[in-house]
Amino acid sequence: MTSNLYYVLISPYSLAYMVQYRSVTTAAGECRGDMWAVCARISSDVTCARHANLQRSIRRCFYIRSTMCEIMLLRDHGDYPVASRMKVIVWDEELAALAKRHTQGCVPEAYKCRHTLRFWTPGQLNFEFYADKMPFTMSLISTAIKRGHMQKHNITRDIVEKYQPVGPKGNVKELALAIFDRVTAVGCGLTTWKLGGKARAFFTCNFFSENDYNRPVYKTGNSPGEKCIKKDETFKNLCFAQEPINPNEHNL
């Protein structure tokens, strides 16, 4: 019998662009968490059966997909203004640790608890999966990436210049966060478990910053990357990873 797959984006601050995550937690039995999972004690029902380090493969998946999206939007697509200072996204251990702990609580509502001294207003993706059988991890992540990428049809020039979460044709939150030029780092975590005979997964990614309402998604210019101190060697229209961008400042 063919399994029924349900992919549900469940956070108003979400982004369906998956990056590498530090480890996978496989939970035995029912997974129950607290309302603020990051701040509170992790549910005693969560027992870690194994950990798998998937950094390299997931990082590559996100790096290629997101950067291709950035290049498409900011260089090759005539409907959008070019970005003058957008850098490649790097992995952050603190964001990953917060995301991993959040998924172990199995509760998506944790906006308040992801604020830290380094990250004043971090963005977040929450992605929930349930089906008869658990797919391969990369298949699950790839599906979420594609869902977010398809929002390119909903983003307009007006939204780039003055961010709103919904455009004339639908939601833009996920993709808008992917191309937000204050997002310079990300960290993710994934927990999987069984519930009522069904396979469940909860995936969270935390980002350096989130979009500000009515402010630009990114700073524009006459040519891509014209305000970069140095360009990335592979993706010529993006700034290199050490570009000094403060995620806690606002675009004007």
From Swiss-Prot:
Main location: secreted
Domain SCP: 63-207
Record SUPFAM superfamilies: PR-1-like
Keyword Translocase attributed: no
Subcellular location(s) per record: Secreted
Protein's UniProt keywords contain Signal: yes
Role summary: Inhibits platelet aggregation induced by all agonists tested (ADP, arachidonic acid, the thromboxane A2 analog U46619, thrombin, and snake venom snaclecs (TMVA that activates platelet through GPIB, and stejnulxin that specifically acts through GPVI (GP6))). May act by competing with fibrinogen for binding to glycoprotein IIb/IIIa (ITGA2B/ITGB3).
Family note: Belongs to the CRISP family.
Protein name per its UniProtKB record: Tabinhibitin 9
Species of the source: Tabanus yao (Horsefly)
